[in-house]
Each structure stands twice: as C-alpha cells, then as structure tokens.
Design a protein with these regions (language model features):
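Intrinsically disordered, low-complexity activation-like regions
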Residues: 1-145
Length: 145
C-alpha cells in the first residue's frame, strides 16, 4: 500500500482535499503501521515536502481549519528548528481563528524539544542514534518525543 501512496503522488496532490489525504497517509500511516521501527518515519520527508508545497502553492489556504491543522503535522514532526518555527507560526495563526481548539500546545512542545536537542530523542533507539546524557535525563523525566 505504501508503494501506491508514493507512485501516485502527482495524482494525490492535484486538489487541496486529495493533497491533505496524501500528506496524512505519509505522516500518520507509517507512524501507526510501522510503530517502534525506523520505518515509522519513512514518509516524513515526502510528507514535509508535500505540506510545504500545499502551503506555498496556496492550496493550504483553501482548506477548512481542521484540514489545515492536518497539513501542518509533517512540519510539527520535522527535526529541523526552522521548520519547527514555521509549524509554530502556522499553528498560532490557526489558534487565532479558533475558539474551541488549542492548536498551539502540541506545536510548541514539539518545537521546544527540537530547539533543545536538535531532534526528537524518542526516535534515537529506532534510528540507531546515540542518546546524549541530556536526552536520557529528558526521557527519564517523562519526555514524550
């Protein structure tokens, strides 16, 4: 199934609605079907590229707020501080438009982890990365990401 998601990318990205479906599959499908393996993040790079494409092409602005929030998920999951800043900005803009959904909390907590560590320490053991002493303390104290 993942191969189909990748092969037909151009078709998926033709409309804002199918674009968000594709981004959600890339961002969430792999996280849930390949949990606790390096494959959990195998859709991240393409999902991020597609999300940025949606934002900068103007398709993002045509989506309802909930779909905009889903479009931003790959930004929130990126291990790049500049992308995290962009995520926090867009989620804060969504929060200004919504009285009922707190879009800021999760975006800020993801951003803080990447700003502090340059990555998400919880991924280390699955990606074969060494965990630093500070990351170990963070994880021992309930760090989520």
């Amino acid at each position: 199934m993942f191969l189909i998601i990748l092969i037909y990318q151009a078709e998926w990205m033709r409309t804002p609605e199918s674009g968000i479906a594709h981004i959600t599959l890339l961002d969430q499908f792999t996280r849930n079907t390949k949990r606790a393996t390096a494959g959990a993040w195998s859709g991240d790079e393409r999902g991020l590229r597609n999300a940025l494409d949606m934002i900068y092409s103007g398709k993002y602005a045509k989506l309802p707020q909930v779909m905009q929030a889903m479009t931003l998920m790959p930004l929130m999951h990126a291990e790049h501080s500049e992308i995290q800043d962009l995520s926090a900005y867009h989620y804060s803009e969504l929060a200004k438009k919504s009285e009922h959904i707190d879009y800021n909390g999760s975006a800020k907590s993801h951003r803080d982890v990447v700003v502090n560590f340059g990555r998400f320490p919880a991924r280390n053991k699955y990606l074969g990365r060494e965990t630093t002493a500070l990351e170990a303390v963070y994880q021992a104290n309930g760090g989520k990401f």
